[in-house]
């Protein structure tokens, strides 16, 4: 009876759990059904236990069944160890999902899983209690999952969580509700059952919750992007550091190989010197033995042998002394090199380090006349132009080994100088003018080219200590304080290379004063030198004057020539015009130059007589009583009277023009 009751309880529990998973809206009913089944199953198990314990008759029969129970319990206790962890994980994930998107669905799935697990636990307990179960019970147990197994829903949820983690950056914010702040149909039905106030309050709470979740989602997204950027930057920094380390390792290996080569060469030189010393010692011992043998025999020696031996001994002594000196100097040089190169000093490895002691053309232009120029410049580096290649300028890194004076005086910016720099690039040395120095910094390719030249020449690179010292000397030169003597030297240096003095008159007066003082002191040589300077100054002034007035005189000559030519041409034009006027016919439309003459002042006697006759006929003969007498007399005798009468008539213009004209039409 107990076995049948347990089987029936298990059969009731399984469909209830399946209904819980399948129906989205039947959460409460499913949970109630499962709790009722649990209570009934518990009661059945307890009753069966009490009945089994109370009956003493079937103890012998139940002993083997108890052994089977222990075995099955020991087998089934091992897998459930992982089950609580999974359930706890699901519970924590569910609790976290309440603050993330898709929380309602996960809750329902979690409840369904819990109900399934409880049902299976109780089924297996009933299975162990009842030893003689039927085939139906075994089929039901085989259909349900065991405690150690993971269901498909769990695996799907784990895979979906991993996918959500991987694609969390691409996902958009979703809190389980739509744009109208409502969920599925069940949620809509529940909101419809509420009052309007409760519904508004619920929607307001959901809005606040959505804002909080949005902020958290954006913060997480920003943090993830920031972490990604940091990782990328760290990777870049690590790659750059690795590249720098590789470069330094390569340079160190080159330096070490170079040092090994130098040491091997020094060892070879020392071996050669030691061999030569041993040979000299052996020769001396042989000569000593010879002299001892000769003295023992007491034979007279020839002069040639004696002198030749002495000369040879002297030569040998000199050669031995020279070899000793050379060995001492070489050893002293090695000791000095060892002292100069401390163990902590490192050679230059970057162009930025060498740029600290680089001199530009602007600095050289400022310092070329300074008293500290040669001392400060030696040991510094410059970027010198050596020519063009494929129409592009080529530059090299070179070290300044000295300052010399060239034969050519050239223009350097605003000053003139004849100084040149003795530069060294590897084994090559050459003198360059200051105007070929560049103002730009060293490039990486130029720096590597210089290093290769130094290594091939077997020369050592400058150390950082030397660069620091030279940098300090450059700073001291920039902050140099001049005294009176320095200023006088600078002025003399600048005057040496000036083509002409700034003021010829002042220079001439100064030279004349110096000449007068020299003549007073009786120094004729100095007076002669000053006179030569004066003559040279006069020649320069005359040359400048000629050069200045050269263009002016040429222009004035051209102007005078043009004036003379214009005069000649104008005279020719006047002659031609007068000739044309004579031969030209009268043209009434041409304008002519003429002066107007008054009709009354005309000198024609016939016209004048006609006018007088008309006037007498009109106004009577008493108007002009003297007219016939004047007409009868000669024109030359009575000019004054005639002019007076004419002037009287001309004055009364109204009378002159007061006459009638008859026109017949």
Swiss-Prot record:
GO terms for biological process: endodermal cell fate commitment; negative regulation of transcription by RNA polymerase II; stem cell population maintenance; transcription elongation by RNA polymerase II; Wnt signaling pathway. Residues 1-208, 223-352, 622-647 are annotated as: Disordered. SUPFAM superfamilies: Plus3-like. This is RNA polymerase-associated protein RTF1 homolog. Residues 105-125, 223-235 have a biased composition (Basic residues). Residues 348-479 form the Plus3 domain. Its main location: nucleus. Component of the PAF1 complex (PAF1C) which has multiple functions during transcription by RNA polymerase II and is implicated in regulation of development and maintenance of embryonic stem cell pluripotency. PAF1C associates with RNA polymerase II through interaction with POLR2A CTD non-phosphorylated and 'Ser-2'- and 'Ser-5'-phosphorylated forms and is involved in transcriptional elongation, acting both independently and synergistically with TCEA1 and in cooperation with the DSIF complex and HTATSF1. PAF1C is required for transcription of Hox and Wnt target genes. It is found in: Nucleus, Nucleoplasm. Residues 187-208, 236-246, 264-286, 627-642 have a biased composition (Basic and acidic residues). The Plus3 domain mediates single-stranded DNA-binding.
């Amino acid at each position: 009876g107990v076995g049948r009751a347990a089987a029936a309880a298990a059969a009731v529990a399984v469909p209830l759990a399946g209904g819980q998973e399948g129906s989205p809206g039947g959460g409460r009913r499913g949970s109630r059904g499962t709790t009722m089944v649990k209570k009934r199953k518990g009661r059945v198990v307890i009753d069966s236990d009490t009945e089994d314990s109370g009956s003493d008759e079937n103890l012998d029969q139940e002993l083997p069944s108890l052994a089977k129970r222990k075995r099955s319990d020991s087998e089934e206790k091992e897998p459930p160890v992982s089950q609580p962890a999974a359930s706890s994980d699901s519970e924590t994930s569910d609790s976290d999902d309440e603050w993330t998107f898709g929380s309602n669905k996960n809750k329902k799935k979690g409840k369904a899983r819990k109900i399934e697990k409880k049902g299976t636990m109780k089924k297996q307990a009933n299975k162990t209690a009842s030893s003689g179960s039927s085939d139906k019970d075994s089929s039901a147990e085989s259909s349900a999952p065991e405690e150690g197994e993971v269901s498909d829903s769990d695996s799907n949820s784990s895979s979906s969580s991993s996918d959500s983690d991987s694609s969390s950056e691409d996902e958009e914010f979703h809190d389980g509700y739509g744009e109208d702040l409502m969920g599925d149909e069940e949620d809509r039905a529940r909101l419809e059952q509420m009052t309007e106030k409760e519904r508004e309050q619920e929607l307001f709470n959901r809005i606040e919750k959505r804002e909080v979740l949005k902020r958290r989602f954006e913060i997480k997204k920003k943090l993830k992007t920031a972490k990604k950027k940091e990782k990328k930057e760290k990777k870049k920094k690590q790659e750059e550091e690795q590249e720098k380390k590789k470069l330094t390792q390569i340079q160190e290996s080159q330096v070490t190989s170079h040092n090994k080569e130098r040491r091997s060469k020094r060892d070879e030189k020392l071996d050669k010197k030691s061999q030569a010393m041993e040979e000299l010692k052996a020769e001396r011992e042989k000569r000593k033995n010879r002299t001892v043998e000769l003295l023992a025999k007491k034979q007279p020696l020839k002069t040639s042998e004696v002198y030749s031996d002495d000369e040879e001994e002297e030569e040998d002594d000199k050669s031995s002394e020279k070899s000793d000196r050379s060995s001492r100097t070489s050893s002293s040089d090695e000791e000095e090199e060892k002292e100069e190169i401390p163990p902590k000093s490192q050679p230059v490895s970057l162009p930025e380090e060498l740029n600290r002691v680089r001199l530009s053309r602007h600095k050289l232009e400022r310092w070329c006349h300074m008293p500290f120029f040669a001392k400060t410049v030696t040991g510094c580096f410059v970027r010198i132009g050596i020519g063009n290649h494929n129409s592009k300028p080529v530059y090299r890194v070179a070290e300044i080994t000295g300052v010399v004076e060239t034969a050519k005086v050239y223009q350097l910016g605003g000053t003139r100088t004849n100084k040149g720099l003795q530069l060294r690039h590897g084994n090559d040395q050459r003198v360059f003018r200051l105007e070929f120095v560049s103002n730009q910094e060293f490039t990486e390719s130029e720096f590597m080219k210089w290093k290769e030249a130094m290594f091939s020449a077997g020369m050592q690179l400058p150390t950082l200590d030397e660069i620091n010292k030279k940098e300090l000397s450059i700073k001291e030169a920039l902050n140099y304080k001049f005294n009176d003597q320095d200023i006088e030297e600078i002025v003399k240096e600048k005057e040496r290379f000036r083509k002409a003095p700034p003021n010829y008159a002042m220079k001439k007066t100064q030279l004349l004063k110096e000449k007068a003082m020299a003549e007073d002191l009786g120094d004729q040589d100095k007076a002669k030198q000053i006179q030569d300077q004066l003559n040279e100054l006069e020649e320069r002034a005359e040359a400048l004057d000629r050069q200045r007035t050269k263009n002016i005189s040429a222009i004035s000559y051209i102007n005078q020539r043009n004036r003379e030519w214009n005069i000649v041409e104008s005279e020719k034009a006047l002659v031609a015009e007068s000739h044309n006027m004579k031969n030209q016919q009268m043209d009434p439309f041409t304008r002519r130059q003429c002066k107007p003459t008054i009709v009354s002042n005309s000198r024609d006697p016939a016209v004048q007589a006609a006018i007088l006759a008309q006037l007498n006929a009109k106004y009577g003969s008493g108007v002009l009583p003297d007219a016939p007498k004047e007409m009868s007399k000669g024109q030359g005798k009575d000019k004054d009277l005639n002019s007076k009468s004419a002037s009287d008539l001309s004055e009364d213009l109204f009378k002159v023009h007061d006459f009638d004209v008859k026109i017949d039409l």
